[in-house]
């Protein structure tokens, strides 16, 4: 396989791909990779490469900046989403705490009401006991006076 065979092979490949949509602009016309016969083509390629180098460098810088910007934006978005999720969890936690406090306050009010009812019942029972004691003491004193009265009053 000689240098001419290589060139013909490249020409066939590039011509075959130019018929495909979207592929023709990706392939340049075939050029030899190196100067086999000393006809000066290799210097042309080197000059073209040097001329294209600033354009490629500019393109590389633009792509790098665009990629870095996209990465920073994605990171920023993730940080914001994480912060929003943390804030939502904290809000939900505070909502749960407030609901628990409201339930405990309601129970405390109910217990306070029951405490007042029990205190009133206890006072009522105490008054009843005091009244029963007085009645009992009166009955005992009246019973103890009755036998003396019976002895003094013979009927």
Swiss-Prot record:
Domain of life of the source: Eukaryota
BP GO terms, sorted: response to testosterone
Record protein name field: Alanine- and arginine-rich domain-containing protein
Taxonomic source organism: Homo sapiens (Human)
């Amino acid at each position: 396989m000689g240098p001419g065979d290589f060139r013909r092979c490249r020409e066939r490949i590039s011509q075959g791909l130019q018929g495909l949509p979207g592929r023709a602009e990706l392939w340049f016309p075939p050029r030899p990779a190196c100067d086999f016969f000393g006809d000066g083509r290799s210097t042309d390629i080197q000059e073209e490469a040097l001329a294209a180098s600033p354009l490629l460098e500019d393109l590389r810088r633009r792509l790098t900046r665009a990629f870095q910007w996209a990465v920073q934006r994605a990171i920023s978005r993730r940080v914001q989403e994480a912060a929003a999720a943390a804030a939502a969890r904290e809000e939900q936690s505070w909502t749960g705490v407030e609901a628990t406090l409201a339930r405990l306050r309601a129970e405390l009010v109910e217990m306070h009401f029951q405490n007042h009812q029990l205190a009133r019942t206890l006072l009522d029972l105490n008054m009843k006991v005091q009244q029963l004691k007085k009645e009992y003491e009166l009955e005992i004193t009246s019973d103890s006076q009755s036998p003396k009265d019976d002895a003094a009053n013979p009927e």
